[in-house]
Amino acid sequence: MKLTPMMRQYFEIKENYKDCILFFRLGDFYEMFFEDAETAARELELVLTGRDCGLEKRAPMCGIPFHASNSYIGRLVAKGYKVAICEQVEDPKVAKGIVKRDVIKVITPGTYTDSSFVEETKNNYIMTIYSDLERNRCSLAITDISTGDFLATEGELEKGVILDEISKFNPKEIILLDSLDQELIKDITLTTPALISRKPIEYFEEKFEEVLNAQFGEKSNSLSLMVKKSSNALVKYILDTQKISLTNINDIEVYSLVDFMTIDLSSRRNLELTENLREKSKKGSLLWVLDKTETSMGSRMLRRWIEEPLVNKEKITLRLNAVEELFNDLSLNDSLKEALHDIYDIERILGKISNKNANAKDLIALKTSIGKIPNVKGIIENCTSSLLRNYHHNLDDLRDIYELLEKSIKEDPSLTLKDGDLIKDGFNSEIDELRLAKTNGKDWISSLENREREFTGIKSLKVGFNKVFGYYIEISKANYSSIPEGRYIRKQTLANAERFITPELKEIEEKLLGASEKLCSLEYDIFLDIRNEVENHIDRLKTTAKIIAELDCISNLAFVALENDFIKPEINEDGETKIENGRHPVVEKVIPKGEFIPNDTIINKDDNQLLIITGPNMAGKSTYMRQVAIITLMCQIGSFVPASKANISVVDKIFTRIGASDDLAGGKSTFMVEMWEVSNILKNATENSLVLLDEVGRGTSTYDGLSIAWSVIEYICKNKNLRCKTLFATHYHELTKLEGEIHGVRNYSVAVKEVDNNIIFLRKIIEGGADQSYGIEVAKLAGIPDDVINRAKEILEKLEMESSKDNLDLALKEVNASKEEMKEASITSSYEVKETLVEEDKIEIKEEVISKASEAKTHKEDDQIQLDFSAIGKDNLIKELSEVDILSLNPMEAMNRLYALVKEAKNLI
């Protein structure tokens, strides 16, 4: 059997879109067949039917009305599918044979622009990644076709670099070079929910000069070869999916990875910059506190500022000075916010214009927005800060575009472009003439209706119109007997009425419909001319939109600073950060006003380089550490900060190792994840970085963990290529002995007050280490049963009585002394990387850290030694006692070993 002609056409088109669900236009429906139909029926809850296709079995089929397609497309795209829209590209009335069809657009998660599914305040990015294995380099290109943003960068081909950029932009779709390392592809897949496609090297490397010149013109000539190749693939992908060149993508913003603060994936999550950890929503994040912007453009820009803090002191100062000027003039800033409030999303309107799907209401929104610009410009006219002066100077009032739209487009135009009612009277003489003819025709229809009522005596007689039957005379069945015989021609019978026509009515109908059809067609053509004229000025419009967005951010930061009692920080590059009465901006927002306890911080590259913070759980150690990082970050985006005074040293990177989590999909345990994060920090932090380490080593045995934590502290403080500012929270109180032993280490703790065997968390950071962890008290607060609490106290008392704290102190001193005897050269020399297998996965830990940790713990086999004192005398007992490795034992093992030794010693007396 042979396929039907229509089904042959379907398969020919589907062959080129195998990775898409093909929406195949048949009349007023989009139909899907075979596997596409089965997938769509399942995902969209549609009825699966069948259609004869020429084969023995009917083709599985389902369909949706074309006029309601957007919601169905959005649901599929949200689930990670690509949808190819196949339209009839010729009029069925004039088609010879089967109607020609072709795919006019491919809609993907990264190219979908429908406002019902794309968040107003978020960019919808798509990313390409290119790699050169020989040079060990990679390049990335990123765009949001709805706004016209197009960015690119290049750097070392390292997993961390790529994953950090992915976490920063959070793209909905990623196109990879198919020869990219498989392990890296796996890591990318586990890191992001983005739809991932793979393309051959030719897709990146062929015709890049031609493609980029066509899209960007001479601007592309100065790009590096690496950037050209990733950008080439991205532009090609846009052309492949949109089927047109998008004029709003007309420039490439090439940025360097060192232009902005590096914040790795883990740190973005831990600091909850744009979404909270628990619900992945904006509420409870830093963005939630800071975002009181007036425009969608400003909100997206602020999000990007938070994701990309500045590292250039001069640029930070420019923003801070602009914020300060508006902060100091409340009336001025209120006026500015009011003027910005009525400005629509110019960037996304331009995206619609570029994509040829902007309607008349979009142009009215654009006109309204442009009309606000002179007021905005006037408000900041007398501002003195450099940034605000630049905004005023460069802000284009776009008067010519405003006047064009003001005189051409109706204030309340039709949503459907081909239905007319778009163009104002007086703009085009031919439109005015056709409207007059149409109006006269309607007057005639009204006159006819009155005349027929008088003639028949039927007061309810009316003349109506629909697209199927045209004009008609409708008479209710109750008045049917009053119709003069032979006056009307019956056209349609309804349940309660009859519809008729007359030769005279059909004659005027032809004239009216001819005028209406011609009017709609002419209005549509003129509208397209106006839209194209606006598109010719897209460069000016994009520049203006960016200034409005930045101005909104500056105004917003001034407003938020006033609302939350933030202060302007000072900036330095000396390496010392001083914060007086610092507060966590999110935490203080969610607890009753006035209850947050502020804290001071001094951290530098000298005597306060690494702060060891001890204290019980729930006391506020993690909040304090995060607050220092967030205050630093806020300063570097140009924001005022929550403190009474702050002098912030610019940092190039923020790293955090906070909280316990595993990576089951990646096959990594909690401890494995912790070690990977620590390894990443030790390899990538610099002397200008800020590092937060919380409970390093807690995922393993006590002395393993203590040894690792100790050696990490030494490595950070003694490696002359590192010495980064570090906040180190721990429950290993033994580490507090490092103050005075290692230069730069200082002890701090969270103050706790004991009242009637209960503890009160004072949330205050004070100098000196904590003397205990209060773990049982915290367990009691958490609601652990009293029986468990009481038994825990008994066990703790026995352990504390029988443990030999003095011996432990001595051991710690001896281990430290052995380290001090090491030559300084070995401390400051270049550190080699050693690969260590941990739980069947690989972690790279600096060899120096491994060797230092090993000093505090002997080989595991020693733990298994069974002492048989029945065969030895006192000398042997002393010898065996001296060989017991106390550092390798957990508290219970130490107690059992001590008990056995004491018992045997008594037998020898």
Swiss-Prot record:
InterPro entries recorded: DNA_mismatch_repair_MutS, DNA_mismatch_repair_MutS-lik_N, DNA_mismatch_repair_MutS/MSH, DNA_mismatch_repair_MutS_C, DNA_mismatch_repair_MutS_clamp, DNA_mismatch_repair_MutS_core, DNA_mismatch_repair_MutS_N, DNA_mismatch_repair_MutS_sf
Keyword terms, alphabetized: ATP-binding, DNA damage, DNA repair, DNA-binding, Nucleotide-binding
Biological function: This protein is involved in the repair of mismatches in DNA. It is possible that it carries out the mismatch recognition step. This protein has a weak ATPase activity.
One Gene Ontology term of the molecular function aspect: ATP binding
GO biological process: mismatch repair
Xref: HAMAP family: MutS
UniProt family annotation: Belongs to the DNA mismatch repair MutS family.
Annotated GO CC locations: cytosol
PANTHER family: DNA MISMATCH REPAIR PROTEIN MSH1, MITOCHONDRIAL, DNA MISMATCH REPAIR PROTEIN MUTS FAMILY MEMBER
Sequence positions that bind ATP: G615, P616, N617, M618, A619, G620, K621, S622
Gene name per UniProt: mutS
Name under which the protein is recorded: DNA mismatch repair protein MutS
ATP-binding recorded as keyword: yes
Lineage, highest ranks first: Bacteria, Bacillati, Bacillota, Clostridia, Eubacteriales
Signal peptide: none
Statement: the UniProt record of this protein carries the keyword DNA-binding: yes
Origin superkingdom: Bacteria
Pfam family, one: MutS_I
